[in-house]
Amino acid sequence: MASVRIREAKEGDCGDILRLIRELAEFEKLSDQVKISEEALRADGFGDNPFYHCLVAEILPAPGKLLGPCVVGYGIYYFIYSTWKGRTIYLEDIYVMPEYRGQGIGSKIIKKVAEVALDKGCSQFRLAVLDWNQRAMDLYKALGAQDLTEAEGWHFFCFQGEATRKLAGK
């Protein structure tokens, strides 16, 4: 098994991050939904007031190899606030390339996000998963996550594009 390192993303990683975002969307059967550009990822994640934070998983080259590290996974997270529980971290995306799954890389990304949550004083760590992705649900439960759909019956809603403009009267 190759050596893997989880680290904070750098601005120069945006091309790899976008590639992985597209792979995740394809896996989720939602590839037509990806509208983000590499430039937007740079502007939104690496300015003075970033909208998101990102971790990347990279495979380190074997000793003596000329190739550099290869980004094979990522996790994008940001901070939200719960009026009941306070500071919360939300993992928007987590993805590992298929050929690197089953090596604990996803778990390492999740554990690193948990470390960030504790360092920032967060009381909860939230994420969502499509209802057909049983492998991911099993992983999250094995790591100690609670399924809030089962436990509390929450449904999450989203106003997008035109619905937001209409709601805002614009």
Swiss-Prot record:
Reactions catalysed according to its record: S-(2-aminoethyl)-L-cysteine + acetyl-CoA = S-(2-acetamidoethyl)-L-cysteine + CoA + H(+); an alkane-alpha,omega-diamine + acetyl-CoA = an N-acetylalkane-alpha,omega-diamine + CoA + H(+)
Domain N-acetyltransferase intervals: 4-168
UniProt subcellular location: Cytoplasm
Main location: cytoplasm
GO CC terms in record: cytoplasm; extracellular exosome
Disulfide bridges in this chain: none
Active site: 140
Expression tissues: Widely expressed. Under physiological conditions, SSAT2 is expressed at lower level that SSAT1 (SSAT). Many tissues express only SSAT1, several tissues express both SSAT1 and SSAT2, and bone, cervix, ovary and pineal gland expressed only SSAT2.
Residues that bear N6-acetyllysine: 29
Chain residues that bind substrate: 27-28, 92, 152
Binding site for acetyl-CoA: 94-96, 102-107, 133-135, 140
Keyword terms of this UniProt record: Acetylation, Acyltransferase, Cytoplasm, Transferase
Record GO biological process: nor-spermidine metabolic process; putrescine acetylation; spermidine acetylation; spermine acetylation
Induction entry: Not inducible by polyamine analogs.
GO MF terms, alphabetically ordered: diamine N-acetyltransferase activity; identical protein binding; N-acetyltransferase activity
Superkingdom of the source species: Eukaryota
Enzyme Commission numbers on file: 2.3.1.-, 2.3.1.57
InterPro entries: Acyl_CoA_acyltransferase, Diverse_Substrate_AcTransf, GNAT_dom
Record-stated family: Belongs to the acetyltransferase family.
Reported function: Catalyzes the N-acetylation of the amino acid thialysine (S-(2-aminoethyl)-L-cysteine), a L-lysine analog with the 4-methylene group substituted with a sulfur. May also catalyze acetylation of polyamines, such as norspermidine, spermidine or spermine. However, ability to acetylate polyamines is weak, suggesting that it does not act as a diamine acetyltransferase in vivo.
Complexes and interactors: Homodimer.
Protein name in UniProt: Thialysine N-epsilon-acetyltransferase
